[in-house]
UniProtKB/Swiss-Prot annotation:
It comes from Bacillus subtilis (strain 168). It is found in: Cell membrane. Belongs to the ABC transporter superfamily. It is a peripheral membrane protein. This is Manganese transport system ATP-binding protein MntB. InterPro entries: AAA+_ATPase, ABC_transporter-like_ATP-bd, ABC_transporter-like_CS, Metal_Ion_Import_ABC, P-loop_NTPase. The keyword rRNA processing does not apply. One of its GO terms (molecular function) is ATPase-coupled transmembrane transporter activity. The gene is mntB. Probably part of the ABC transporter complex MntABCD involved in manganese import. Probably responsible for energy coupling to the transport system. Pfam families: ABC_tran. The complex is probably composed of two ATP-binding proteins (MntB), two transmembrane proteins (MntC and MntD) and a solute-binding protein (MntA). ATP binds at residues 36-43. Keywords: ATP-binding, Cell membrane, Ion transport, Membrane, Nucleotide-binding, Transport. The keyword Cell membrane applies.
Amino acid sequence: MFPVELDNVTVAYHKKPVLQDISLQVPEGKLIGIIGPNGAGKSTLIKTILGLVPRASGDISIYGKDYKDQRTRIGYVPQRGSVDWDFPTSPLDVVLMGRYGRIGLLKRPKKADVEMAKAALTKVGMHDYAKRQISQLSGGQQQRVFLARALCQNADIYFMDEPFAGVDAATERAIMTLLAELKEKGKTVLVVHHDLQTAEDYFDWILLLHLRKIAFGPTENVFTIENLQKTYGGRLTFLKDKVLAEGHKE
């Protein structure tokens, strides 16, 4: 039984396919990068798995069941730009939202939930900012808060939509440390990622996506010049650098 399984999933906006015939069996305990050009359907794929975007056809299962039956096993970090950061709330309150899937929306968090939220903020270096207004934080700090919320969900599968976008180098390192720790705990982590320069170092599995699945598997097998050309059309300077680098290895 796979953490995530897709069988011939197609998604269309206004009858135009944006994802077509996607079939995947996501292995457990892997750190997986979802990579492709702008408009390739990377964020749409995550949102479709989470039931946020309807699919035109195909089947999706989480540990063999429907997403609705497995919500407590899933953590989600959306794109930072999709969040209303002017909403009057504190980092601690945001992180506590990660507990509501388990305690229920209408129940007050218990002391143990609050302590877990504080521990998650400490984990991402944001304990001292717990009571500030979320709008007063920098982009990197806001992203750390969302990561802390995901930690508080204590999930088995984590979906992260461009967690490195617009963050400073220190925050990027902190995020990668956190992702590595989740993997060590046997968690399955799927990350939408844009930076091809870091992809080989960051992920042990990669999904190359451009409306269709181009390739999916261990990074050393998938992240090849041929597959990148299929995904990006050979337009990237990175491909030239990779060709030169691989030429030097021979």
